[in-house]
Amino acid sequence: MQCFKFIKVMMILFNLLIFLCGAALLAVGIWVSVDGTSFLKAFGSLSSSAMQFVNVGYFLIAAGAVLFILGFLGCYGAHSENKCVLMMFFSILLIIFIAEIAGAVVALVYTTMAEQFLTFLVVPAIEKDYGYQTEFTQVWNSTMEGLHCCGFNNYTDFNSSRFVKENKVFPPFCCANNTDSHTVEPCTEDKAKSMNVQGCFKQILQKIRTNAVTVGGVAVGVAALELAAMVVSMYLYCNLK
């Protein structure tokens, strides 16, 4: 009986933390989506290793909403000893766990396919929004400067962009070497071609491979927490009358 009470309290505290983290992510996600410029001013340039090629605000909102719901279900289910809610908590966590494993397998086995899929999504956005959408341009400039890269694949991603068509030059990062992220001379297509600066996707992959132990450790830690939460929720479920 004492063991059951202890696990119940731990379940409530753990999920309360998840609930608060979810609320914080939701708030930040809404802030980034509504006023990304003030967010960048408050926190400075985003870390190059944390750059994303998707809309960061919507990603944070989605992640925050999932954590918010999970935390609420875990807290409420454990506190009220509601078997239905505990089963919902377990089921959602199991789906997330399976999706994470599937995503990791796809990322490892089908890297080329993932690159093609992301190219299909990202390159049109570069062609349309780079140089004209403030937050999008700031994120890409921070990424290209921090990682010493150009575009998603390389400089050719800008060939059909509004930025190149109207300004007749490429972003300066496409003509910079690894020691100098800026260039004084205009970055023409010929110069960008001769410099052949690597694309940001390959640079990020290289960073991940370089820090594979850290990335793997974090992934294993998250998976272990999810498994522990599922085991605890099922223990409470099975011991409730």
UniProtKB/Swiss-Prot annotation:
Subcellular location(s) per record: Cell membrane; Lysosome membrane
Matching InterPro entries, A to Z? Answer: Tetraspanin/Peripherin, Tetraspanin_animals, Tetraspanin_CS, Tetraspanin_EC2_sf
- Tell me what topology the record assigns in the membrane: Multi-pass membrane protein
Supply the Pfam families for this chain.
Tetraspanin (PF00335)
Q: Which GO terms describe its biological process?
A: protein stabilization
Record's Gene Ontology CC terms?
cell junction; cytoplasm; lysosomal membrane; membrane; nucleoplasm; perinuclear region of cytoplasm; plasma membrane; vesicle
| Superkingdom | Eukaryota
Major localization listed first in the record, in broad terms = membrane
> What's in the keyword line of the UniProt record?
Cell membrane, Glycoprotein, Lysosome, Membrane, Transmembrane, Transmembrane helix
Glycosylation annotated at which residues? 154
PROSITE patterns, A to Z:
TM4_1
Mind telling me which residue stretches traverse the membrane in this protein?
Answer: 12-32, 53-73, 89-109, 212-232
Assembly state and interactors?
Interacts with SLC19A2. Interacts with NTRK1/TRKA.
Known function? Structural component of specialized membrane microdomains known as tetraspanin-enriched microdomains (TERMs), which act as platforms for receptor clustering and signaling. Participates thereby in diverse biological functions such as cell signal transduction, adhesion, migration and protein trafficking. Regulates neuronal differentiation in response to NGF by facilitating NGF-mediated activation of NTRK1/TRKA receptor tyrosine kinase and subsequent downstream signaling pathways. Plays a role in the inhibition of TNFalpha-induced apoptosis.
Sequence similarity:
Belongs to the tetraspanin (TM4SF) family.
Q: Sorted alphabetically, which PANTHER family does this protein's record hold? A: TETRASPANIN, TETRASPANIN-1
**What is the official name of this protein in its record?**
Tetraspanin-1
The record lists the organism as Rattus norvegicus (Rat)
Lineage at the top is: Eukaryota, Metazoa, Chordata, Craniata, Vertebrata
